[in-house]
């Protein structure tokens, strides 16, 4: 394939207008943007205004606030977010009018169908790894299209339509919708207990679903998997596709050695399979988990023929992803100034990785941790792990659980979580958005770092705290 040639995707039959229900979602907006750039008429609806909605409008996409049956007028197909139920008035109207209604992942699979798809899966690290792969391929002149579940800071967008056939996507296991995808290459970063309601509480079912995802690769495709993850090691012998591994272990095909962390700067050497030479990598993204994410991207880039200088340069230039250990700046409080870091982590393992990275970057500073639990089901099923990891913070401020559309579960509250952490002689303060600034004025000492963490509204709360409060 000549990567300098414009790749033209075949049109989807008679489809001209596509309507997205829940267009502001992280997994939806990028697909809508790519289709808009391909020349389709795109409309969408969402429950409220947001920066994402404003960006889509700036591109010329019609976005309605609120869900009403008249919003789907003219649509040839309706794309449904997994967060939207089947009783939504737009979904009901589309079915009555016999307009096809498809899940988000089915449209993503359609975009990928005629391309060289590279799908990044895993319970943790998907967004960062997808961003890294996209960045390295772009730096190497491959001009990929990409759809990411977060905003790539270098371009301020979740998605981009490139000229080549390469298409990098984040593959979502939360509703098992990654099984719609049939990529040419796939990465699995790890397999951990999350979204277990999708898998009927059966971890073996989760594990085998990841294996099934890898077997959607063609027999000549490539699986790239992390050798540091225990569950991946369990399924490794059963993967019946060409496979490469990455990690710190000596037997990994792509191995990191001599890793050091100096402030935000990670430096390590990557040992690659012959005939590829070792590379010295400098990378402004802290933590062991991000070294692993970088290794996955190096493996994909190397296997696709990206030159060594572009790999090294691409990692040096990488500006990160929105809400992934994102430094918002320094803010003055009544008793001193503190750095504010915004992070999307919402699973105990993600929180642990973030705290570990924090301790490496700022070993002498105090961690003031503002955490918003996300979903009642997750808080309930991982209660013990949340207690263990949140007890590691120096000061913990807990917000109410962000429901994300779930019904409250009796006894599953932030207060109950706080009480168990307090039983370990840890101070925990329950805060709301309204009381947060006053509480921080009371707690913050000069030189502290505030970690605002969670997958709900806390991201916007962090921005508001930085700007206005």
From Swiss-Prot:
Keywords: ATP-binding, Cell cycle, Cell division, Cell shape, Cell wall biogenesis/degradation, Cytoplasm, Ligase, Nucleotide-binding, Peptidoglycan synthesis. ATP binds at residues 122-128. The keyword Cytoplasm applies. InterPro entries: Mur-like_cat_sf, Mur_ligase_C, Mur_ligase_C_dom_sf, Mur_ligase_cen, Mur_ligase_N, MurCDEF_pg_biosynth, UDP-N-AcMur_Ala_ligase_MurC. This is UDP-N-acetylmuramate--L-alanine ligase. GO terms for molecular function: ATP binding; UDP-N-acetylmuramate-L-alanine ligase activity. One of its GO terms (biological process) is peptidoglycan biosynthetic process. Belongs to the MurCDEF family. It is an enzyme of class 6 (ligase). Its EC number is 6.3.2.8. NCBIfam families: murC. Gene3D superfamilies: Mur ligase, C-terminal domain, Mur-like, catalytic domain, NAD(P)-binding Rossmann-like Domain. Pathway: Cell wall biogenesis; peptidoglycan biosynthesis. GO terms for cellular component: cytoplasm. It catalyses: UDP-N-acetyl-alpha-D-muramate + L-alanine + ATP = UDP-N-acetyl-alpha-D-muramoyl-L-alanine + ADP + phosphate + H(+). Cell wall formation. It is found in: Cytoplasm.
């Amino acid at each position: 394939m000549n990567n300098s040639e414009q790749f033209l995707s075949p049109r989807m039959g008679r489809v001209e207008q596509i309507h997205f229900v829940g267009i502001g979602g992280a997994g939806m907006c990028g697909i809508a943007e790519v289709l808009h750039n391909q020349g389709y008429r795109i409309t969408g609806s969402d429950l409220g205004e947001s920066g994402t909605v404003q960006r889509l409008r700036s591109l010329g996409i019609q976005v309605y606030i609120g869900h009403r049956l008249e919003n789907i007028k003219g649509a040839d197909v309706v794309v449904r977010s997994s967060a939207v139920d089947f009783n939504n008035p737009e979904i009901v109207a589309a079915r009555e009018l016999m307009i096809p209604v498809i899940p988000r992942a089915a449209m993503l699979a359609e975009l990928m169908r005629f391309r060289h798809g590279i799908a990044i899966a895993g319970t943790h690290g998907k967004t960062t790894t997808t961003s890294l792969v996209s960045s390295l391929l772009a730096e190497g002149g491959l001009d990929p299209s990409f759809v990411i579940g977060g905003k790539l800071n270098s371009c301020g967008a979740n998605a981009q339509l490139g000229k080549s056939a390469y298409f990098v996507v984040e593959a979502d296991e939360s509703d098992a919708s990654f099984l719609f995808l049939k990529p040419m290459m796939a990465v699995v970063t790890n397999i951990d207990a999350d979204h277990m309601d999708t898998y009927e509480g059966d971890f073996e079912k989760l594990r085998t679903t990841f294996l099934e995802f890898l077997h959607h690769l063609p027999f000549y495709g490539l699986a790239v998997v992390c050798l540091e993850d225990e569950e991946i090691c369990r399924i490794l012998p059963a993967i019946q596709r060409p496979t490469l591994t990455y990690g710190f272990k000596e037997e990994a095909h792509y191995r990191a050695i001599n890793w050091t962390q100096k402030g935000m700067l990670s430096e390590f050497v990557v040992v690659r399979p012959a005939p590829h030479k070792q590379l010295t990598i400098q990378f402004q993204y802290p933590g062991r988990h991000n070294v692993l994410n970088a290794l996955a991207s190096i493996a994909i880039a190397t296997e696709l023929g990206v030159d060594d200088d572009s790999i090294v340069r691409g990692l040096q230039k990488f500006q990160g992803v929105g809400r992934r250990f994102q430094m918002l700046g320094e803010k003055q409080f009544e008793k001193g100034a503190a750095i504010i870091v915004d992070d999307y982590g919402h699973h105990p393992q993600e929180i642990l990785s973030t705290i570990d990275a924090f301790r490496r970057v700022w070993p002498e500073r105090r961690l003031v941790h503002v955490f918003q639990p996300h979903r009642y089901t997750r808080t309930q099923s991982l209660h013990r792990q949340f207690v263990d990891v949140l007890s590691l913070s120096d000061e913990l401020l807990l917000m109410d659980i962000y429901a994300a559309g779930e019904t409250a579960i009796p006894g599953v509250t932030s207060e109950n979580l706080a009480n168990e952490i307090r039983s370990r002689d840890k101070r925990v303060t329950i805060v709301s958005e309204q009381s947060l600034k006053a509480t921080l004025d009371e707690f913050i000492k000069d030189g502290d770092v505030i970690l605002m963490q969670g997958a709900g509204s806390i991201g916007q709360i962090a921005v508001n705290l930085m700007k206005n409060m």
